[in-house]
Amino acid sequence: WESEKMLAMAIYIKLQSRGTPVKSIINNQNRATLAPFLAKGKKFFEQRRGLLDMSCKHCHEDNPGNMARSNVLSMAMPNGFPTYRLKWQKPGSIHRRFSGCNKNVRAKPYKRGSEEYTNLEFYLMQRSAGLKWETPAVRN
């Protein structure tokens, strides 16, 4: 998930779509198949965790634009990932960002590529349908 080659390939592929809208892959034919994964991703997004007893929703839905320490909270839209993060000084995956968020709320992070993070990524991608691809974005 974090090898230079994998990130470079993901950036290259998504760069081809830069400026075009993110499209939902859910349609009438696959809705029943994909609905459980979408529901699990949404549940994870809204579920409290860690010593701070916070969910993704508390920061990214209830407080986007506000500051958490020295960072401006985003709306949790993954259309810029993999992204070059100034803190990392190199590109990183959205699963790396998920791990960082879990650490910030004092929760044990899941492994990159885990079912939990994959379902969360799927849910967030569906929420971002209609936004334009920005990969690779730059974040603080």
Report residues per predicted region.
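Post-cleavage N-terminal segment of exported redox proteins
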Residues: W1-A39, G65, P82-P109, Y117, ...
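Periplasmic/extracellular electron-transfer cofactor-ligation site
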Residues: E46-M75, N104, K108, R127-T135
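Short, intrinsically disordered, charge-biased short linear motifs at domain edges
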Residues: L38-R48
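Cell-wall glycan
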Residues: V72-N79, K90
